[in-house]
Amino acid sequence: MIGYLKGNVIWKAENKVILETGGVGYRVLVPSTVRLKPVGEKLELFVYTYVREDSLDLYGFKTMEERELFETLLSVSGIGPRAAINILSSLSYKKFIEAILTEKVSILKQVSGIGPKTAKRLILELKGKLKDMSGDFEEPLPDNRNTELSDALASLGYSELEIEEALSNADIKNNGSLEENIKKALGYLGSKGS
């Protein structure tokens, strides 16, 4: 099984990349949260190898935690690799785990193809499994401050997914000023683009 690839990008398209490693090109499917490097640059991916009777597919992730979450999602009845990639493309790692642990069906239903029944099944089957993966999540910002920050980032042209990812990963503090939190979010979003 292939678990990790590091190589040069020789071709890329939306949610797909071919990495050349040791003279071999590996076609890897990735969630939209993976920022693909330009052709010719190096890229590292943690890989899940999905084997079916008639094919072998590689799914790549920027962190081992995301790869493990993908594998955990596949354990849910009715969730295949396409649905799992769709979930990880729509919600950040932390946001998804928080939605499961806090049983927020409304957040899960925002993912295309996830209705109320599937959202409830995800919560039921994953809540116990994801407690170990949850880490120490800081309490989210109060709704009004979170909304102000989201609105500010949206006015700068960032997508809902980018905003959600920045809110989850940019070391934004409850006691920080709006200006400080905007700077941190922009710093995070800027570092992802490079």
UniProtKB/Swiss-Prot annotation:
Region entry Domain III, spans: 141-194
InterPro entries named in the record: DNA_helicase_Holl-junc_RuvA_I, Hlx-hairpin-Hlx_DNA-bd_motif, NA-bd_OB-fold, RuvA, RuvA_2-like, RuvA_C, RuvA_C_sf
Gene3D superfamilies given in the database record: 5' to 3' exonuclease, C-terminal subdomain (1.10.150.20), Nucleic acid-binding proteins (2.40.50.140)
GO biological process: DNA recombination; DNA repair
Region (Domain I): 1-62
Annotated segments matching region Flexible linker: 136-140
Notes concerning its domains: Has three domains with a flexible linker between the domains II and III and assumes an 'L' shape. Domain III is highly mobile and contacts RuvB.
Positions of the UniProt region annotated as Domain II: 63-136
Subcellular location: Cytoplasm
Main location: cytoplasm
Subunit architecture: Homotetramer. Forms an RuvA(8)-RuvB(12)-Holliday junction (HJ) complex. HJ DNA is sandwiched between 2 RuvA tetramers; dsDNA enters through RuvA and exits via RuvB. An RuvB hexamer assembles on each DNA strand where it exits the tetramer. Each RuvB hexamer is contacted by two RuvA subunits (via domain III) on 2 adjacent RuvB subunits; this complex drives branch migration. In the full resolvosome a probable DNA-RuvA(4)-RuvB(12)-RuvC(2) complex forms which resolves the HJ.
Family to which this protein belongs: Belongs to the RuvA family.
Gene Ontology annotations for the cellular component aspect, listed alphabetically: cytoplasm; Holliday junction helicase complex; Holliday junction resolvase complex
Segments forming a coiled coil: none
UniProt KW keywords: Cytoplasm, DNA damage, DNA recombination, DNA repair, DNA-binding
Family annotation (CDD domains): UBA_RuvA_C
Physiological role: The RuvA-RuvB-RuvC complex processes Holliday junction (HJ) DNA during genetic recombination and DNA repair, while the RuvA-RuvB complex plays an important role in the rescue of blocked DNA replication forks via replication fork reversal (RFR). RuvA specifically binds to HJ cruciform DNA, conferring on it an open structure. The RuvB hexamer acts as an ATP-dependent pump, pulling dsDNA into and through the RuvAB complex. HJ branch migration allows RuvC to scan DNA until it finds its consensus sequence, where it cleaves and resolves the cruciform DNA.
Protein species of origin: Halothermothrix orenii (strain H 168 / OCM 544 / DSM 9562)
Protein name as catalogued: Holliday junction branch migration complex subunit RuvA
Cited Pfam families: HHH_5, RuvA_C, RuvA_N
GO molecular function ontology, one term from the record: four-way junction DNA binding
HAMAP family: DNA_HJ_migration_RuvA (MF_00031)
